[in-house]
Amino acid sequence: MEDSIDLQRESLNKLIPESGSDDTSSSDEVNGLPTSSDGADDVSLINSEDLNSSLLKSDPGGTNKSDQTKNDETDSNDDQRIVLSGGVELEEVQETVKVYNNVKQALLEVETTDESQLILDKIKRDSQYSSDTECESRDADSELEDIQLEFRSKYPQLQIPYSDELCVKIIPYLDIVYDILSGVVTSMYYTRAKRAAMDSKKAFLSAEDFRNLDINLFTAGYFGLRRQLKVGNIIYEKFRDELARSKSPKIQWWGPIDFANYVLAPEVLVSFVLDTCQNKRSVQLTSRQDVYELFDNTTYYGNTVTDNEPLESWELSRKKRKYGPTNNQKTHKTRKKKS
């Protein structure tokens, strides 16, 4: 009898856990009943936590608390798209976040702007600019016509040939170059060139010296600079050797090409004008000094009108197709109507 009771006790001891838990929970587990609500919450928390956090909690080394704090900081900073590294201060992080948010907000504002409105605004601005430019161009053309009419009424006998025609007409007057180089003829342009060379501290004409020159003092008046340079090129090709061998400090300072363009070319044109206008009663050009004064008084006309007219004869037809009659043709028609 006693042996039977001992066997029953041993069987019950096997069913009861040795951890010392209370009888209620043990009996529930034995009978297959659900556990308490506290136990269910614990199971839910474990299943919802990150795997790394679970491993840290089960770490027997006791470092789970500090590592969990670092993980929480990293997760928080990941939400702000900032990765902390060792040695970075909190104020720097906050400032970086502030700048990032400002840039992001600005980009969002740009993206939300109506692009079609921007395009319309640009078209409107471009149209206004084009209209203003066209008005300015018309005003400039009108001003040029007024200047040309005044010049033609004052100097009706002065003709401005195209460059190819002019380069043929000046050939008989190239001999004046020998007279200027030898000192037989006094040249106003040579005197000005000499003064420019003496005022310079350089042995040769430098870019700075050239920028400081008043180029109007070396321009053949109403002929304009473009035609003058064409004449200068012919002079240089014909007198290249003489200019290169010259011992004159002034010619050496200017150099053969610039001396031909800005000293000799105006003098050749002076001879051309003096010869073609001497026999015309309407103009009193009896000396080179008279032509010098004419050139000085008509430099503005050459720069603003002549240099904007076709240089070659073939340019005239192209300009006529694009813009209509040139200023020369308009002036001729105006004079014809008045007569």
Curated annotation (Swiss-Prot):
Family matches, as SMART domains: RTC4 (SM01312)
UniProt biased composition (Polar residues): 45-66
Biased segments, Basic residues type: 330-339
Region (Disordered): 1-80, 312-339
Subcellular location: Cytoplasm; Nucleus
Functional summary from the UniProt entry: May be involved in a process influencing telomere capping.
The protein's name in its UniProt record: Restriction of telomere capping protein 4
